[in-house]
From Swiss-Prot:
UniProt keyword annotation of Oxidoreductase present: no
One matching Pfam family: Glucosamine_iso
Protein name: Glucosamine-6-phosphate deaminase
Taxonomy of the source species: Bacteria, Bacillati, Bacillota, Bacilli, Bacillales
Organism domain of life: Bacteria
UniProt keyword terms in alphabetical order: Carbohydrate metabolism, Hydrolase
Length: 247
């Protein structure tokens, strides 16, 4: 893993946007894997700003998001489809039909998972996958204990994850109990991975990630086995790791 240490959230976002922008500029055709949550928000803002400054078109880009809640229609303001439209898709010239998220309203969720996996394969795989991390090490919605061999599947969300995401919903009860997520193997098949880690709440997770122990109990640990991962971590996220390193 190539680890880039930055000062804070803003510097992390700028660096991440610059890296993504470079890949978008340099490729005649590119497939991005995208993430939601608080972590990548300013990366998207910075990416839009770069596109505007440079007159860069996104018409050659297609995207696949990591995950989507089950039971929320696309128009629901808490759906990840809505999140992506508000924060990125509506501000760049990417054709809407080239933006993909799992459909959490599909009549057969199992069928939807298979179709999503096939669509990624038909697109030739993901060139660069943007990732955040849960404090319990989850990536996408792959909670601890998820097999490393998993493909896109339906998950029951851990209570910890529902609580962490409750800040976006009126009450904890409104947070969906299930989601569709790319599997860990799906994520590992991306040619390149960009993991962003910011803030004190992620400090233990970052330290664990750097401990080199690869275990299904900490899903992100598998990233140690991927040949092309860049991690951008800010000072707060790196604080526990830095302390341990100096002991
Ligand atoms: N499914 C998402 C993940 O894709 C995200 O990386 C993670 C961290 O979220 P945040 O960036 O808000 O801390 O939790 C959510 O549950």
């Amino acid at each position: 893993m190539n680890i880039i240490h930055v000062k804070n959230y803003e510097e992390m976002s700028q660096k991440a946007a610059a890296l993504l922008f470079e890949r978008i500029q340099q490729s005649p055709k590119i497939t991005l894997g995208l993430a939601t949550g608080g972590t990548p928000e300013n990366t998207y803002t910075a990416l839009i700003a770069k596109a505007k400054e440079n007159g860069q078109s996104f018409s050659h880009v297609q995207t696949f998001n990591l995950d989507e809640y089950v039971g929320l229609p696309a128009e629901d303001k808490n759906s990840y489809r809505h999140y992506m439209e508000q924060r990125l898709f509506d501000h760049i010239d990417i054709p809407k039909e080239k933006t993909h998220l799992p459909n959490g309203m599909a009549p057969s969720l199992e069928e939807e998972c298979r179709a999503y996996e096939n669509m990624i394969a038909d697109a030739g795989g993901i060139d660069i996958q943007l990732l955040g991390i849960g404090s319990n090490g989850h990536i996408g919605f792959n909670e601890p204990g998820t097999p490393f061999s998993s493909k896109t599947h339906v998950v029951e969300l851990a209570e910890e994850t529902r609580k962490a995401n409750a800040r976006y919903f009126p009450t904890l009860e409104d947070v969906p109990k299930q989601a569709i997520t790319m599997g860990i193997q799906t994520i590992m098949e991306a040619k390149e991975i960009l993991l962003l880690i910011s803030g004190k709440a992620k400090a233990e997770a970052f330290a664990k990630l750097c401990s080199d122990e690869v275990t299904e109990a900490f899903p992100a640990s598998i990233l140690n086995k991927h040949p092309n991962v860049t991690v951008i971590a800010d000072e707060e996220a790196a604080s526990v790791y830095t302390q341990k390193a100096h002991l």
